[in-house]
From Swiss-Prot:
It is an enzyme of class 2 (transferase). The lineage of its organism: Bacteria, Pseudomonadati, Pseudomonadota, Gammaproteobacteria, Pseudomonadales. GO terms for biological process: gluconeogenesis; glycolytic process. Coiled coil: none annotated. This is Phosphoglycerate kinase. One of its GO terms (cellular component) is cytosol. Belongs to the phosphoglycerate kinase family.
């Protein structure tokens, strides 16, 4: 994967437009989770150090395109950036006609989704973005799977289009995990439905040695193998699909599970052997023996890809399985990559962020890359790099 990298460019005195993913949760005008902003800071600081006139853009939320809405304004992000950088970061609302920024200074553009044509990737809007800069830097991996004006269109028309350090690091890490992974490789894929992760499961079944499944996905595999799943969430119409995947790769199944009679924070948790699951039981986590078995598989791996918690970890009594696997990944010497919103929440809860080789910032983009799909915003950078 060959793209031009921002780190290799001379940015002195250049007008640089950086597309970041600053789509953060905001409550009462205050940023409540700053992970994405923190991830973008090294790129912004580097561009400033290189003497660029820096313009940063992003979307936030899902406003009606072409219309301003105060709740989706990037004003709280501009205030956060000002504090984080120790300098004024003005929020510019009217920028398409041109904006005055000096070398070494920075501005934040208002939400790109307030511009008509952003989501439809209009050439007219993309050309307006491109006219603002000498160099366009795509650094928002989380939106790389969407072909929009500020992620894809602008890269077609900008004089120079490059990948920022954050995007480049994502591509390098995913390439390492999926391109030619150190073997043996284990993948954990968990979620409510096989149908939503079918392409991921099929793609990983071709490169990994152990495909550990969790959540509703595991229930479908259990049912496909003839085990009772009670009233657990599973997909009866995908049993043959599960069997076909299990025929291609080792899919270790739970030997014990944690069940409850209801899905609730106050639900009583009971550990049962898989054969003992009753008709009115719901499987909400893997059991302690299964967690220990899976942890051993992870310890023997050289590459680990983790997408999804294996139980309802939001309720502590159903979090042990995810906790044990998180700790096993943390203690492993394998190259480990984790991605997906629920996965990041589990990593935070169990305090293992510093012990995972790479944590992907992109939810949908992460999954599409794992599926082997082309990410439009990356593809256009590759095309531009070829000249």
């Amino acid at each position: 994967m060959t793209v031009l990298k921002m780190t290799d460019l001379d940015l002195q005195g250049k007008r640089v437009l950086i597309r970041e993913d600053l789509n953060v949760p905001v409550k009462d005008g205050v940023v409540t989770s700053d992970a994405r902003i923190l991830a973008s800071l090294p790129t912004i600081k580097l561009a400033l150090e290189k003497g660029a006139a820096v313009m940063v853009c992003s979307h936030l939320g899902r406003p009606t395109e072409g219309e301003f809405s105060a709740e989706n304004s990037l004003k709280p992000v501009a205030e956060y950036l000002s504090k984080a950088l120790g300098r004024d970061v003005p929020l510019v609302a009217d920028y398409l006609g041109g904006v005055d920024v000096k070398a070494g200074d920075i501005v934040l553009f208002e939400n790109v989704r307030f511009n008509k044509g952003e989501k439809k990737n209009s050439d007219e809007l993309a050309q307006q973005y491109a006219a603002l800069c000498d160099v366009f830097v795509m650094d928002a991996f989380g939106t790389a799977h969407r072909a929009e004006g500020s992620t894809h269109g602008v890269a077609k028309f900008a004089k120079v289009a490059a990948a920022g350090p954050l995007l480049a690091a994502e591509l390098d890490a995913l390439g390492k995990a999926l391109g030619a992974p150190a073997q043996p490789m284990a993948a954990i894929v968990a979620g409510s439905k096989v149908s939503t992760k079918l392409d991921v499961l099929n793609s990983l079944s071709q490169i990994c040695n152990q495909l550990i499944v969790g959540g509703g996905i595991a229930n479908t595999f259990l049912a496909a193998a003839g085990h009772p799943v009670g009233k657990s969430l599973y997909e009866p119409d995908l049993l043959d699909t599960a069997r076909a995947i299990a025929a291609k790769v080792s899919v270790p199944l739970p030997v014990d599970v944690v069940v409850a009679k209801e899905f609730a924070e106050s639900a009583e948790a009971t550990v049962k052997l898989i054969a003992d699951v009753a008709d009115d039981d719901m499987i909400l986590d893997i059991g302690p023996q299964t967690a220990a078995n899976f942890a051993e598989l992870l310890k023997a791996s050289q590459t680990i890809l983790w997408n999804g918690p294996v139980g309802v970890f939001e309720f502590d009594q159903f979090g042990n399985g995810t906790k044990v696997l998180a700790k096993a990944i943390a203690e492993s010497s394998a190259f480990s990559i984790a991605g997906g919103g629920d996965t990041l929440a589990a990593i935070d809860k169990y305090g293992v962020a510093d012990q995972i080789s790479y944590i992907s910032t992109g939810g949908g983009a992460f999954l599409e890359f794992v599926e082997g799909k082309v990410l439009p915003a990356v593809e256009v950078l590759e095309t531009r790099a070829k000249g």
